[in-house]
Amino acid sequence: MKRVLAINSSPKRGKSNTSLILNPFLDGIKEAGADVELFYTRDLEIKPCTGEFNCWVKHPGECYQQDDMKQLYPKLEEADILVFATPVYVDGITGSLKNLVDRMIPLIKPIIEVREGHCRHPPRKRVRKGQLVLVSNCGFWELDNFDPVVLHMKALCRNMSRIFTGALLRPHGSALKTMMKMGQPVDDVFKAANEAGHQLIDDSKMSPETLITISRELLPLEMYLQGVNREFRQALNALTIK
């Protein structure tokens, strides 16, 4: 049975727009027979890396900080598949996920080697060389807003000796929840997220067609802007009235 470790770094946890895509994806993974553990960074104490390199030169493979990374380290080491879920925050991942990623340094050795023509750190023997999948949501309309996050995850995989298997990306994500509540036709997006979970376990990959459906245009740009800006103006007007 494949072991899947999912990290949802949205501060809104299960009520987030990110969870709208993550949850059916994880359901599909479970339905395909894999074991899934889900953690919310909002519920974890993960301190920033202090850059002391104690985990490299004093106590190899062990971080000196006493926080919730202690319970995550063995899970990160043993996971066949890592699923990192994050909304786009200022063109990147959330701060809480960045803290977690920075604290993964004990999983690699300080020695530098050249792999595929580039300097890398080798993983420790106990660390499984598995896959990584990104799930992300953003408030801007265009799909290219995810480019920096995808690039970051691909670089992370190269450094951590994991295979980047793909990304479930949901642009103009707030529209998905609104349209769902209004009964508008968005079920295909959720079904595609679920299907992506099945494909990941059954085929060790996700089809481009499935990922395109997850990211498809929900409504025209101008209509999206009108709706979002109307909500913000109403909120600001309410402050003025008070």
Regions found by a protein language model. Give the residues of each.
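Short, glycine-/small-residue-rich phosphate/pyrophosphate-handling segment
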Residues: 95-96, 109-163
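Beta-strand-loop-alpha "switch" segments that mediate conformational coupling across diverse proteins
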Residues: 166-171
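A short acidic, helix-capping loop that chelates divalent metal ions and anchors anionic groups
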Residues: 174-179
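N-terminal beta1-alpha1-beta2 submodule of the flavodoxin-like/Rossmannoid cofactor-binding fold
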Residues: 1-112, 158, 165, 187-242
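Histidine (H) residue identity feature
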Residues: 59, 118-121, 152, 172, ...
